[in-house]
Amino acid sequence: DAVGLTKGERIYIEAFRNSTQDFFRELIAVSSKIGATPFYYFNDESFTRSFLLNASEAAIKAHGEIHRRLMAESDAYVAVRGNDDVFALSDVPEKKMALYRKNYLQPVHSEVRVPQTRWCVMRYPNPAMAALSRMSLKEFEDFYFDACLVDYRKMEKELQPLKKLMDRTDKVRIVAPGTDISFSIKGIGSVICCGHRNIPDGEVYTAPVKNSVNGVVQFNTDTTYNGIFFSNIRLVFKDGKIIEASSLVNNDKLQKILDQDEGARYLGEFSFGMNPFITKPILDILFDEKIAGSFHMAIGNAYTTADNGNRSAIHWDLIQIQTPEKGGGEIYFDGRVVRRNGKLL
């Protein structure tokens, strides 16, 4: 249902890690029974690591060109990740990661997959994800299925008032411990995410007007990006641009990521996390950005569906949880409080 695949269409199916293989086979079987043509690609961050540590710039570029052609010929895309080793790329030099983002992630995914296909990205539960979440496997599986199998039709209806409010809002201000940031979302529009692009899902996103962002924001949720761990990221903006940035760990790598390209120092997304079954971080952005009572901002590339014009090889969602346990906070729309301590008013 997520990608609406029909007979005669082509689907690019990508699976990561051995723990996904049973589900991967089922996706291939189901798409074939429908009468679609699957291109199935088994991937693994350890494969990517081996490639990047040894590949030339020309080889990385050629790798991206091959997959861009395949993606351009596809009507739909599904990715399922096992996330057995979120740090698999941690020792790949940043220069190589920058080439990979520029020549593979941006042209294949940001420029083709996201705007041109019907796509869905999801996870598959396994012991490693449970361990990162500090849960038993059984507890994690229950959490996973609760979060993923929420009633998305009901969610879509319930999020309509927030979308309508965002669509008519100009000025946004966010105040929380370590945070006082303002920006405009006038004319950008907003999108409800309810089970079509991510599993689990549950957010309403827009984007700040590119040059309107001013102030400071502190993200109180740990995160990983391309296998690197970051904590307590703090960003200072002036006229849309990040002019200061820090992380408690791997601060030097944060600076290199922000220097990827011009767009990496501007925001491409602002979003409310709205999944009621996701209430604490598990070090997986796909889940953490949906935490009820949170918001996230993405540095880098904007989606064409809520477009502020920013383009970058980066799209990195950074999360602040505003529940009382995490310090609380307020979000103002045109001077009026619309959410306090994680609860919409």
Task: Go through the PLM ranges and name each one.
Residues 18-19, 83-85, 126, 188, ...:
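Short, glycine-/Ser/Thr-/acidic-enriched flexible segments
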Residues 214, 230-232, 239, 265-269, ...:
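Active-site lining segments that contact anionic ligands and/or coordinate catalytic metals
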Residues 1-215, 341:
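Active-site bordering "gate/hinge" segments
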Residues 282-344:
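Internal helix-turn-beta structural module
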Residues 201-245:
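Oxyanion-binding "anion nests"
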Residues 177-178, 185-187, 237-239, 333-336:
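Short acidic-glycine loop/turn motifs at beta-strand connectors
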Residues 244-309:
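Dual-mode signal for accessory low-complexity, basic/Gly-rich regions
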Residues 165-171, 229-231, 323-330:
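A short, compositionally biased
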